Amino acid sequence: VWLLTACNVSVDLPVVSSDSDLQFPDLAKTWDEGMPLGNATVGALVWQRDSALRFSLDRTDLWDLRPMDSISGPNNRFAWVREQVMKGDYLPVQKKFDHPYNQQPAPSKIPGAALEFSLEKLGSPSDVHLYLNNALCEATWENGATLKTFVHATEPVGWFVFENLPSSITPTLISPKYSTGGDKAGNSVEGQDLRRLGYKQGTIDEDANRITYHQEGWNGF
């Protein structure tokens, strides 16, 4: 699970700047340039997608590891790969690993989800600062509004708090799309379409203070 908690009261989160901090005048516009937060299990990237502030959420242990013939058997070992390299013939390795990986849906990393906050009324922040000493990201707006967010050092939990907002802001949970879009095969670099995994689309349940995403994976995972 990935638990992200909102704080609805003013909190004191003292920070200490360092020369290695990341600081920019606005949010990154692509996920791979987002402000990184996380520990060895869960992680988040803070960035802007269109007109929304987005937390891209993930876990390191979300994998579809259904059995595949291409990675089973006695040749599924590095020593066998080394033998082919020493013989000067790498094609058997490509046929065993690369070709099936590009053609079959698994094994595959499964994405987590995302949390979005509309910036339609609030606008984009004028300063985004990642404090490395404190593992805390702070976004500041010219009207005095702030966002502070961090991930627990050892637990799969994250927090965020908005302060001095001119109006309320409601998060939206965005789930990966497993049953929409095309099913065209990609490759090991570009990634595969999630529809090829064959999952039934998960459900999102909301109540007054909680949003929960339920997704069943292969073999009941």
Where do the model's predicted regions map?
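C-terminal motif of bacterial Sec signal peptides marking the signal peptidase cleavage site
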Residues: 4-6
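Aromatic-residue-lined binding/catalytic grooves and analogous aromatic/hydrophobic interfacial grooves
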Residues: 11-221
